[in-house]
C-alpha cells in the first residue's frame, strides 16, 4: 500500500507523466511451464505514430523493465522516463508487465522479458518497429533484467538442445530478419550480485542509514529466490556471468547509473569496470548524495531537476546505439 501511495505521489508534480498509448497482450510460448500465461506490453508512442506507421516508417524501440525488487511495481512507474524518451528520441517506448514474485519467482521475470523482445521482433511490421534497433532500460530489479534478459535470449538462440525450448514457441518461428538486436542498455541502480549478502552490502555502503530497510530487502530476496541454489546463475547475478557470455550477449553501448548512498553502489561500479575491460563502451555515472531510486521520490510538489538532466543524458546513449557509428549491437 505504501508503495502504491508513493508511486501515486510521484505522478503529481508538473509536467505530468503521460499515460500509455495502448496495451498489447499475447500468450507466452517459450518454455512448457509458461505456456498459457498472458504477457502485457504497455506502449508509449510518438504523436504521429499511426500516420507514420501506415507510411511504412519503422521506429527504434526502448523496452523498459520497472523496479520493485521483483515483487512490487507496475509498468507505468517509469512514465516520466517514457516521456523523456519520446521527447528526445524518435522512438517507441514499451514497458513490460512482467510476472512478479512470490507468485512467480525466478526465472519468470527473465523469461517474460525474452518473450517481450521476441514478440516485438516477430510482430515488428505490424507494430511499426525496427527490430534491429532495440534498447533496453531498467530500474533496480529492472536494471538487473536489462542485463539478464539479453543473456538469456542469447542462450536460447544458441542452444543446441532444442528440447529445452517449446517447439511451438516464438523462437521456433523466427527467421534471421526477426531476431531482436539489442543495441544499447541503460541500467539504473541495478542489483547485480546475489552472492553478496544484504548485511554486507549495508555495512560496506557509504551511508547505511540511507539504504533500503532489512524487512523490505528480505521480502524482495526471499520472494524472488525462495531457494538460494540459483544465486550464482548469470541470469540471477549478471556480475557472475562468464566473460564470453557478457561479450557475445550484451551490446557495445551500455550506460549505468549508480547512487552514492545505495547499498548496490559498489557492485555497480565493479561491473561497469569489468564490462569496460571486456571492450564495451560503458558510461557509468555516479550520482552523488542520492539513495536508491532517488528519481522515484514521492514528492508531490516538484521533481528533482537532476532527474531530467540524467534522463536526457541516458537518451544520448540510446541515440548513439540507434544511430551512432561503430559496433553497437550484441551478437544475438
Predicted regions located by residue number:
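An N-terminal hydrophobic leader/cap segment in hydrolases
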Residues: 1-33
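Alpha/beta-hydrolase superfamily serine-hydrolase fold, recognizing
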Residues: 17, 26-332
Amino acid at each position: 500500500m505504501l508503495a502504491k501511495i508513493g508511486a501515486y505521489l510521484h505522478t503529481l508534480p508538473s509536467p505530468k507523466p503521460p499515460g500509455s498509448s495502448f496495451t498489447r497482450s499475447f500468450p507466452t510460448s517459450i518454455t512448457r511451464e509458461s505456456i498459457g500465461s498472458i504477457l502485457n506490453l504497455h506502449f508509449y508512442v510518438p504523436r504521429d505514430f499511426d500516420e507514420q506507421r501506415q507510411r511504412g516508417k519503422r521506429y527504434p524501440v526502448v523496452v523498459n523493465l520497472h523496479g520493485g525488487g521483483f515483487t512490487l511495481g507496475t509498468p507505468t512507474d517509469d512514465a516520466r522516463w517514457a516521456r523523456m524518451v519520446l521527447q528526445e528520441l524518435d522512438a517507441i517506448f514499451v514497458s513490460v508487465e512482467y510476472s512478479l514474485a512470490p507468485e512467480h519467482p525466478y526465472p519468470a521475470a527473465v523469461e517474460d522479458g525474452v518473450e517481450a523482445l521476441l514478440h516485438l521482433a516477430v510482430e515488428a511490421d505490424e507494430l511499426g518497429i525496427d527490430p534491429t534497433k532495440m534498447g533496453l532500460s531498467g530500474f533496480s530489479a529492472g536494471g538487473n533484467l536489462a542485463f539478464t534478459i539479453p543473456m538469456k535470449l542469447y542462450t536460447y538462440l544458441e542452444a543446441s538442445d532444442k528440447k529445452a525450448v517449446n517447439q511451438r514457441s516464438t523462437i521456433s518461428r523466427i527467421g534471421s530478419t526477426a531476431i531482436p538486436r539489442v543495441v544499447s542498455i541503460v541500467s539504473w541502480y541495478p542489483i547485480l550480485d546475489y552472492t553478496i549478502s544484504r548485511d554486507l552490502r549495508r555495512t560496506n555502503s557509504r551511508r547505511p542509514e540511507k539504504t533500503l530497510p532489512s524487512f523490505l530487502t528480505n521480502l524482495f530476496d526471499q520472494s524472488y529466490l525462495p531457494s538460494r541454489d540459483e544465486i550464482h546463475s548469470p541470469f540471477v547475478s549478471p556480475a557472475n556471468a562468464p566473460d564470453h557470455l557478457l561479450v557475445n550477449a550484451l551490446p557495445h553501448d551500455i550506460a549505468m547509473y549508480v547512487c552514492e548512498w545505495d547499498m548496490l553502489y559498489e557492485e555497480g561500479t565493479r561491473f561497469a569496470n569489468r564490462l569496460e575491460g571486456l571492450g564495451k563502451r560503458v558510461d557509468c555515472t555516479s550520482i552523488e548524495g542520492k539513495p536508491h531510486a532517488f528519481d522515484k521520490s514521492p514528492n508531490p510538489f516538484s521533481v528533482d531537476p537532476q532527474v531530467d538532466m540524467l534522463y536526457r543524458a541516458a537518451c544520448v546513449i540510446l541515440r548513439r546505439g540507434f544511430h551512432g557509428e561503430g559496433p553497437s549491437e550484441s551478437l544475438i
